[in-house]
Amino acid sequence: MGRRGKKKGRPVSGWVVLDKPVGMGSTEAVSKIKWLFQAEKAGHAGTLDPLASGMLPIALGEATKTVPYVQDGAKIYRFTVAWGQERSTDDLEGPVTKSSDLRPAEAEVKALLPKYTGVIMQTPPQFSAIKIAGERAYDLAREGETVDIPAREIEIGRLDIIEHHADHTVFEVECGKGTYVRSLARDMGRDLGCFGHISDLRRVEVEPFTSEDFVTIAELEAARFGAQGEDKPEPADDADAIDVPVDFGAIDALLVDTSAALDCLPQIAISDDAATKIRLGNPVIIRGRDAPVEAEEACATARGKLVAIGAIEQGMFKPKRVFAG
C-alpha cells in the first residue's frame, strides 16, 4: 500500500491581526492560525513574548511576501515596570537577581525619559533571540552562560508615562525595529538606582495595522466552526487539513487584505494587459500624467488587486516580487 501523502493547505492570502493572549508563544499562534484557515503558508511579522499580549500580525499565503514591510514599521507598546527588583529575564518569568528598597518619585522617572528618546544604543536581554556564534542567546542563558551581547542602535519615537504608583509605573512607547522593551525596564531601573523589570506588556499597534484590525482566537474559532462550539476538532500536531468539508467564507472575511501592508509604497494603477505581462516577469511602461518616472519601490495594482512590487526606472515598472492573481 502506498504511503498517504501530506495534504496541501488552501491558497488563502491576507493578514490576521491577532490579539495574542498571554501564555501563547508566537510560533504556537502561527500554527493555530494556519490550522484554523487550513492555509498553505503562514508566518508572523515580529515575535511577541509568551508573557506579552496584543498585536501579532500573521501573514497567510501571498501576504508572506510583504512581511518585511510590516517588520520595519513602527510599533507601540503599553507596559508596566515593577520597581525594586531586577530579574534574569527582565520580566516576571526569571528569578530575582538584584533588589532595592528604593522607589522612584514620578518626577525622577519623568526626568529620565529624554535619555531614552530618539536614536539610542541598547543592549538586548540575555534571554533574547539574538544569535551569538550561531546559537540563540536564550539557549545559552538557559544553560547558565552569561554572554556578551553587543549594544545596537535603535530608535524610540516617544516614551510617555501613563500612570505612576508607589511601586510601579505604566508607560507607552513608540519604537522602531529591534527595540526590546524588557531592556528599557532594566536600564531605567539601573539608572534610577532601584532596579526594575516588566510585569505587564501589551503591543497595541504594529504599523500599518491598528487596534481596529484586531481579531481574537475566539472570534476566529466562532467563524470557523460556528455552532460546533466546544465540539470543534483539535489541531493535529502537523497542522494537516481535516477531512471535513468546510465553508471558509466567514473566517476568510476576517482577513485584512495583503496590500494593507504596503501602504508605505507608491501605488501605481495598471491595465489588465500590463498585469499579465508583469506576472510573467516582464517590465511595462507606466502611463498616466501623475505616474512617477523614478521610484526605488512601488506597488502595481490592477482593478484594486495587488500585482507586484517593483522599481520604476525611467518610466518603466520592473517587477521584483509578483503576486498571484
UniProtKB/Swiss-Prot annotation:
Coiled coil: none annotated. It catalyses: uridine(55) in tRNA = pseudouridine(55) in tRNA. It is an enzyme of class 5 (isomerase). Its EC number is 5.4.99.25. GO terms for molecular function: RNA binding; tRNA pseudouridine(55) synthase activity. Signal peptide: none annotated. GO terms for biological process: mRNA pseudouridine synthesis; tRNA pseudouridine synthesis. The keyword Zinc does not apply. Belongs to the pseudouridine synthase TruB family. Type 1 subfamily. This is tRNA pseudouridine synthase B. It comes from Mesorhizobium japonicum (strain LMG 29417 / CECT 9101 / MAFF 303099).
